[in-house]
């Protein structure tokens, strides 16, 4: 086991604070509408330019082990805030730096670190309650666009495209961000349920221009095994043919004689059919087949529940207004499923999201909810170069998370104003313990730091602006983008309450732990012996 370097007291705390400051100073320059970019070197490819706090934080590793521990703890603030709210990482880092700086002074002056932490925790709890009280619901497209553009560093185009996407797929719908092919941002909306399986044979195509198979008012047959024998299918095919309507078959696979017969019938015009594979694998496939069944009003024909393909009737088939099958995707538009059953299914999947542990599972479950509830929107980010696209994509993803958070818990005045107004909750907060009261005062001063940093990044004088904002009431604040004072919500400078709350809670949590640290242990790196020279090889010269 390698030897350890153990350090105590103020000396080690100072090293930890140095690490906090290095990371926080790199992150804080990105805050606000006039925040600067940070350029990050990459091992492969060009440098990465970003204004996203958590991206900057994740890149920082320091040489000194003790400084690095401080930096890593603040990195945790940024990534935790990002996980919970999706934005507000820079605000959280600035708050953590401020609480640590003020708190270390108090600890050095001889105050009890544990009582300071308790005071900080009580102050934060009071601020969070006050933020909930002053939050306003975020319902309109205009407000959603404003939140999006503020989060994307005052890029109004980004806010507008996110608001449009939310309007089209609903607040529950899935919105994904992809690389675009042009210079402009584009929005692509898939209405209805889409899954990533296409036709099993190109002979099913009936729209040569779009290269898709389009079925109007079709029946939908769902089967959870392979179909290779056409005899199993004949009874149901005859019933569909009598009804003179097309048929979509979704099964584990359709192959051999069965597929050949369907193709021949399709080409001759006897019966318009299309066969596709069922989406997903294993248990996820069963669940998705059940989703499609509920959406279209079908029954999944499965031997597990005693149903067989030969005995299937039209009552077991689902229906939809239109289904489009491409080479790689199938889209079901306006399924005939029962609305109450669809809602119950969505509620059931939401319950699974609550209990899911892995991010992958959660993401897949959320996709299923969106497909049942609304649809899927894809924002394609356009840019002139790859470096610009990465930077823009970071901002669009941040803005998307911020708008979701705003819809969830409402909005508060942006630009650091909400935290200043929430301070009113601390004015009458007395703990009956001098050191805990000092902890409350630390938070009271720290909540000014985001506004101070926004003003500093915009080239203003922080103290002058903070005093002027404190003289005002309600949503009165300073718009660093335009240099004006006024009603922040009226000017469209909004922050999601969830983002502000998460930033404050995570910053205080880690900062409190740092203040109560009195010993740090790091591994002493082993000195590697020098590589010996190639002695005795001198005579090689004569071999030429």
Swiss-Prot record:
It is found in: Cell outer membrane. It holds the Pfam family Cpn60_TCP1. Its main location: membrane. One of its GO terms (cellular component) is cytoplasm. GO terms for biological process: protein refolding. It catalyses: ATP + H2O + a folded polypeptide = ADP + phosphate + an unfolded polypeptide. Gene3D superfamilies: GroEL, GroEL-like equatorial domain, TCP-1-like chaperonin intermediate domain. Disulfide bonds: none annotated. GO terms for molecular function: ATP binding; ATP-dependent protein folding chaperone; isomerase activity; unfolded protein binding. Keywords: ATP-binding, Cell outer membrane, Chaperone, Isomerase, Membrane, Nucleotide-binding. Coiled coil: none annotated. Its EC number is 5.6.1.7. This protein shows ATPase activity. Forms a cylinder of 14 subunits composed of two heptameric rings stacked back-to-back. Interacts with the co-chaperonin GroES. This is Chaperonin GroEL. The lineage of its organism: Bacteria, Pseudomonadati, Pseudomonadota, Betaproteobacteria, Neisseriales.
């Amino acid at each position: 086991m390698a030897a350890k370097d153990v350090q105590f007291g103020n000396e080690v705390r100072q090293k930890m604070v140095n690490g906090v400051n290095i990371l926080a100073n790199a992150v804080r320059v990105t805050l606000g509408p006039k925040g600067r970019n940070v350029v990050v070197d990459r091992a492969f490819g060009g440098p990465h330019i970003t204004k996203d706090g958590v991206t900057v934080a994740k890149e920082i590793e320091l040489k000194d082990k003790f400084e690095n521990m401080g930096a890593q703890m603040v990195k945790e603030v940024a990534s935790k805030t990002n996980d919970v709210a999706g934005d507000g990482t820079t605000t959280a880092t600035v708050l953590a730096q401020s609480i640590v700086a003020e708190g270390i002074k108090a600890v050095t002056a001889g105050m009890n670190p544990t009582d300071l932490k308790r005071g900080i925790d009580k102050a934060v709890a009071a601020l969070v309650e006050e933020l909930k009280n002053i939050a306003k619901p975020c319902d309109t497209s205009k407000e959603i666009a404003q939140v999006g553009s503020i989060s994307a560093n005052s890029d109004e185009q980004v806010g507008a495209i996110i608001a449009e996407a939310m309007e089209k797929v609903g607040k529950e719908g899935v919105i994904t961000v992809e690389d675009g092919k042009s210079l402009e941002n584009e929005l692509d909306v898939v209405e209805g349920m889409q899954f990533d399986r296409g036709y099993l044979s190109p002979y099913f195509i009936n729209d040569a221009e779009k290269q898709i198979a389009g079925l109007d008012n079709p029946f939908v047959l769902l089967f959870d095994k392979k179909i290779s024998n056409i005899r199993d299918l004949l009874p149901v095919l005859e019933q569909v043919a009598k009804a003179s309507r097309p048929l979509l078959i979704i099964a584990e696979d359709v192959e051999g004689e069965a597929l050949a017969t369907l193709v021949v019938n399709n080409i001759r015009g006897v019966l318009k059919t299309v066969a596709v594979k069922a989406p997903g694998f294993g248990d996820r496939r069963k669940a998705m087949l059940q989703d499609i069944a509920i959406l279209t009003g079908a029954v999944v024909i499965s031997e597990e529940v005693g149903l067989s393909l030969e005995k299937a009737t039209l009552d077991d088939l689902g229906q939809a207004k239109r289904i489009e099958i491409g080479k790689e995707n199938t889209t079901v538009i306006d399924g005939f499923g029962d609305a109450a059953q669809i809602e119950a299914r969505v509620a059931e999947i939401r319950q699974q999201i609550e209990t899911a542990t892995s991010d992958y599972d959660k993401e897949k479950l959320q996709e299923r909810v969106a497909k049942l509830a609304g649809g899927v929107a894809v924002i394609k980010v356009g840019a002139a170069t790859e470096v610009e696209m990465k930077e823009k994509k970071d901002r669009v993803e941040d803005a998307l998370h911020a708008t979701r958070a705003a819809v969830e818990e409402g909005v508060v005045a942006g630009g650091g104003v909400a935290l200043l107004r929430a301070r009113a909750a601390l004015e009458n907060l007395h703990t009956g313990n001098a050191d805990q009261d000092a902890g409350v005062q630390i938070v009271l001063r720290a909540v000014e730091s985001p506004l101070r940093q926004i003003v500093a990044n915009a080239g203003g004088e922080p103290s002058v602006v903070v005093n002027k904002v404190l003289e005002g009431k309600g949503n009165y604040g300073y718009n660093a983008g335009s240099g004006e004072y006024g009603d922040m919500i009226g000017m469209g400078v909004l922050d999601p309450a969830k983002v502000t709350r998460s930033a404050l809670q995570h910053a205080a949590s880690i900062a409190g732990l740092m203040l109560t640290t009195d010993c740090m242990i790091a591994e002493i790196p082993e000195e590697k012996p020098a590589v010996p020279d190639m002695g005795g090889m001198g005579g090689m010269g004569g071999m030429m």
